[in-house]
Design a protein with these regions (language model features):
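Phosphate-binding chemistry for phosphorylated carbohydrates and sugar-nucleotides
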Residues: 1-161, 249
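Catalytic-core signal marking the mid-to-C-terminal active-site face
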Residues: 146-295
Length: 295
């Protein structure tokens, strides 16, 4: 399957969640450019994986001199940004699409890059490299002598945890989907300072990207609404053809409370799920009370 995740790699997920699971489980797609990382009883989101690789890259021989910068696609969680801030390096936020990382890698502005859809790579090659990511995880396990659950627990203890999930609503009638996004865009300017589902909006915009290398500009790259306290909801539309459109909703919330680090992400994101529905009127407009795919 082109998307290695807990839904499509269910057999591997079940094995890694069972008693006696091995130290590391990993999956990739058919051509090896995407990856999924698992430990005993532990699923590592692509966003968290990128952050852990950045925080521990100095333990790997090829990156012992440190990183020049990191880059993530806009819908990817901001976990890696927290690592970059502590390391004192640049963190770039790009539109979805690997091509946007290319200029940053070629110009030496970023060493590691990644996206929530399980693509990870570095400046050793201009493309995403799932096998490299798995090997780098093995390097980190060997260098630290820690398990995947221990590495994640230590990472969250230092940086806090960004709970993250993507909800896909598939096969929505194209005119309904387009109307939903148009209405969402129309009210962005009025959202800051208002309260939605019990959370106060800090900022709202439609993401645009100015490439720092070649000066090009990419507009209309997704609607994002951020909340005080670290919450965020991102809305993107894809596939507006005859088979209908897919609405992708990317949900994120942050905590630095150790008592919450072990919470189930869907429970921890309840505020953001409610806020996203209230903002976009998903249930009212589509009749859907739950996403078709939740990762």
């Amino acid at each position: 399957h082109p998307d290695p995740n807990p839904i499509w790699a269910r057999e591997l997920m079940d094995a890694m969640m069972a008693d006696g699971a091995p130290d590391l489980g990993a999956a990739s797609d058919g051509d090896g450019d995407r990856n999924m990382i698992l430990g005993p009883g532990t699923y590592v989101t692509p966003s968290d994986s990128l952050a852990v690789l950045a925080a521990n890259a100095h333990l790997c021989p090829g990156y012992s001199g440190g990183l020049t910068g990191v880059a993530r696609s806009m819908p990817t969680s901001r976990a890696v940004d927290r690592v970059a801030e502590k390391l004192g390096i640049a963190a770039y936020e790009t539109p979805t699409g690997w091509k946007f990382f290319g200029n940053l890698l070629d110009a030496g502005r970023a060493t590691l890059c990644g996206e929530e859809s399980a693509g990870t790579g570095s400046d050793h090659v201009r493309e995403k490299d799932g096998l490299w990511a798995v090997l780098m995880w093995l390097d980190i396990l060997a260098a630290t002598g820690k398990s995947v659950p221990q590495i994640m627990a230590d990472h969250w203890a230092e940086y806090g945890r960004d709970f993250y999930s993507r909800h896909d609503y598939e096969g929505i009638e194209s005119d309904i989907a387009a109307g939903l996004m148009d209405d969402l865009r129309a009210k962005l300017g009025d959202l800051p300072g208002t309260e939605v589902a019990g959370r106060r909006v800090a900022a709202a915009d439609e993401f645009a990207y100015d490439d720092p290398v070649d000066g090009s500009r990419a507009e209309g790259q997704g609607v994002r609404v951020t909340f005080h306290g670290g919450g965020r909801a991102v809305f993107r539309l894809s596939g507006t053809g005859t088979s209908g459109a897919t609405l992708r909703v990317y949900l994120e919330d942050y905590t630095d409370d150790p008592a919450r680090f072990g919470d189930d992400p869907q429970v921890a994101l309840a505020d953001m799920i409610a806020a996203a529905d209230a903002l976009a009127g998903i249930a009212e407009r589509t009749g859907r009370t739950a996403p078709d795919v939740r990762t």
